[in-house]
Amino acid sequence: MLDLKLIRQKPEWAKEKLAARAIKGEEIDELLALDTRRRQVTVQTEELKAKRNDVSGQIAVMKRNKENADDQIKAMREVGQKIAALDKELAQLNEKVTYILVRLPNFPADDVPMSLNEDDSREEYKWGNMPTFDFEPKHHWDIGEKLGILDFERAAKVAGSRFVYYKGAGARLERAVYNFFLDEHQKEGYEEIIPPYLVNNDSMFGTGQFPKFTDATYTITNDGEPLTLIPTAEVPLVNYYRNDIVDAEKLPVNFTALTPAFRSEAGSAGRDTRGLIRMHQFNKVEMVKFCKPEDSWKQLQNLIHDAEDLLQKLGLPYHVITLASNDASFTSAKTNDLEVWMPAQDRYREISSCSNCTDFQARRAQIRYRDDDGKLQFVHTLNGSGLAVGRTVASILENYQQADGSVKIPDVLVPYMQGQTAITKED
């Protein structure tokens, strides 16, 4: 959530920043007008309540002195009616201000490409050599089905489209990938967490998924209370400290978790209908950081490095891009995507998004720490995929495919595959 005080102090700056995220200036004008009226009503209410308290004291004295206080009592009834009307207006104003404020995205950082067009995202650099083949490279879904390690057809029978069965060596490869990821993150100082896979509405609000993206999630009811299947481990990890004060000496705090992610993919009809790229359920290893505001840009670089390190050790070519302002996530001030090379598609595909959310989530979730002066401040939160497991499997199948239809296993994963160096049809 944005700092309303900052919008109040720098309205034109706020309009310019949010225009790069498709927010109209009229929305900010409406917010500020409501905020101004709210502050006026608050002052009027406080003045009337102070007057009521003073006169109530006078009435008590008059009654003790057996003086007639009818006029004062009548006047206080009128004051009470005015206070009740103002309280009602104030509640309505609070609701309207909150409605607008919680739907405004984060301010984009100064070095982000300011554009409403995702094509204006900026490539920063590339790593690795794209593999060359003396045959036409196959798509990962064709490879997986021919090797008998991925079964989309039976998954569709059981659950519908955008689901998959991993089988045999495919299941072992998926497990090898996420165990490798978790081990590497642990070496880098992340604390491994196994969080709840269902979260309440307050948690979804805290990380910014609700109220804007309710259509993109799956929700169940438990004893009349809604619970949402997590779209990412970011939600339970960030909310670990919701309504809490983090010990400043512990900052930065680094969490990592392997969880399934559940997404309805509303609005994705016709996109990536085959393969592992866009699923309703997929495994993902997430990285989350909590830090002091002055450290968050350095921590973003650390986050990117930790994601890159995995791709480099797997020998998978990729590039890093800075997303255009309107392509970044709702909560993010800056997002760097890592996109891995997919030979059969002849293009890069996202495998990690690393975002600095500044104090946006912390303000919604009320996550704070005490500074050197003992004053409460909001932490900054960061999150990144480290990495999306299914997409990693897909990229391994495509980049390491062999002419005979087998797939070589990246060297770093061989120990996780009990020494197996390739997946063949016999596996």
UniProtKB/Swiss-Prot annotation:
EC code(s) of this entry: 6.1.1.11
Keywords, sorted A to Z: Aminoacyl-tRNA synthetase, ATP-binding, Cytoplasm, Ligase, Nucleotide-binding, Protein biosynthesis
CDD domains: SerRS_core
Any one GO molecular-function label of the UniProt entry: catalytic activity, acting on a protein
Subcellular location: Cytoplasm
Binding site for L-serine: 232-234, 286, 385
Involved pathway(s): Aminoacyl-tRNA biosynthesis; selenocysteinyl-tRNA(Sec) biosynthesis; L-seryl-tRNA(Sec) from L-serine and tRNA(Sec): step 1/1
Chain positions recorded as ATP binding sites: 263-265, 350-353
InterPro entries: aa-tRNA-synt_IIb, aa-tRNA-synth_II, aa-tRNA-synth_II/BPL/LPL, Ser-tRNA-ligase_type_1, Ser-tRNA-synth_1_N, SerRS_1_N_sf, SerRS_core, tRNA-bd_arm
Catalytic activity as recorded in UniProt: tRNA(Ser) + L-serine + ATP = L-seryl-tRNA(Ser) + AMP + diphosphate + H(+); tRNA(Sec) + L-serine + ATP = L-seryl-tRNA(Sec) + AMP + diphosphate + H(+)
Top EC class of this enzyme: ligase
GO annotation (BP), single: seryl-tRNA aminoacylation
Gene Ontology cellular component list: cytoplasm
Subunit structure comment from the entry: Homodimer. The tRNA molecule binds across the dimer.
Protein purpose: Catalyzes the attachment of serine to tRNA(Ser). Is also able to aminoacylate tRNA(Sec) with serine, to form the misacylated tRNA L-seryl-tRNA(Sec), which will be further converted into selenocysteinyl-tRNA(Sec).
Similarity remark: Belongs to the class-II aminoacyl-tRNA synthetase family. Type-1 seryl-tRNA synthetase subfamily.
NCBIfam families in the record: serS
Record's comment describing the protein's domains: Consists of two distinct domains, a catalytic core and a N-terminal extension that is involved in tRNA binding.
Name of the featured protein: Serine--tRNA ligase
Organism, as annotated: Lacticaseibacillus casei (strain BL23)
Organismal lineage: Bacteria, Bacillati, Bacillota, Bacilli, Lactobacillales
